[in-house]
Curated annotation (Swiss-Prot):
GO terms for cellular component: cytoplasmic side of endoplasmic reticulum membrane; endoplasmic reticulum; lumenal side of endoplasmic reticulum membrane. Residues 324-334 have a biased composition (Acidic residues). Its EC number is 3.4.23.-. Residues 1-19, 84-87, 158-160, 210-230, 288-290 are lumenal. The lineage of its organism: Eukaryota, Viridiplantae, Streptophyta, Embryophyta, Tracheophyta. It comes from the Eukaryota. Belongs to the peptidase A22B family. Residues 322-343 are annotated as: Disordered. This is Signal peptide peptidase 1. It comes from Oryza sativa subsp. japonica (Rice). Ubiquitous. GO terms for biological process: membrane protein proteolysis; signal peptide processing. A motif (PAL) lies at residues 290-292.
Amino acid sequence: MKTHERAANLALAGLSLAPLVVKVEPNVNVILTACLAVYVGCYRSVKPTPPSETMSKEHAMRFPLVGSAMLLSLFLLFKFLSKDLVNAVLTAYFFILGIAALCATLLPSIKRFLPKEWNDNAIVWCAPFFHSLSVEFTKSQVVASIPGFFFCIWYAAKKHWLANNVLGISFCIQGIEMLSLGSFKTGAILLAGLFFYDIFWVFFTPVMVSVAKSFDAPIKLLFPTGDAARPFSMLGLGDIVIPGIFVALALRFDVSRGIKNRYFNSAFLGYTVGLTVTIIVMNWFQAAQPALLYIVPGVIGFVAVHCLWNGEVKPLLEYNESKAEEEDAVEEDTDSKQNKKEE
């Protein structure tokens, strides 16, 4: 982990804890927390192989429709069933997810302080009476899951904003780290679709705001305001993860070409500007705003202007992580064959 990555992790942890001891301007807190989560997630996504889950163009086109169906389903569940019952089921579901997400987030930092064999030697646990069901884990993962268990218990029992944010930030970092758009074309399709999705469900229906207020699970970050009438400002995790995976793609594009953060800087700046404009407009009109309305043009616009300015539209549009992975595999196979011949 490089110095700037370690500094970003420490800054994110400090900013999350700061409202416990000092009053932090919630608008500034929203922007800094979201940007730091994106920054950390992007750098964690840079690996020898692309992230494990790659989105296709077809998936990107269907995503707003699937998201709309899920959003409407939740709205109807809260409307016709007991709110406490729905949230109890969701809490149980996110309890498991939260432990896994926080474990995966903390593991790289914790591994450095544990014996090597704890990181390498896997333990296989088979379920009683169902031996086909097995789980493989290391002792390091067990250690890393302890804080996750603590925060999930705390959240389930108290619904404290800090426990909510720790789990929410973990979901954001893991989402950005593990998900790949594959190409900028797929990213543009996804962001454009969710641009209209966000506008429709926020401006033209009460569904989005109603679900956000009723959904008692770590799917949004909460920022204390000190105002009894409106105790928290909030930001949905989707407003961090969705643009974040596009920004991460820009960083990996830079790395693949051996250049230093050129397009990443543009995409990250676009995200920061878009989120800042969201906060300004929200405070001006004193009403909820679809954040992607401002973030999507910021991210795509800054990257588009940058590549047009440099005359690099073609390499940007032709970049495909799946093809790059296949080419690397072919090169490795060729090298290994040549080495065998030489031997």
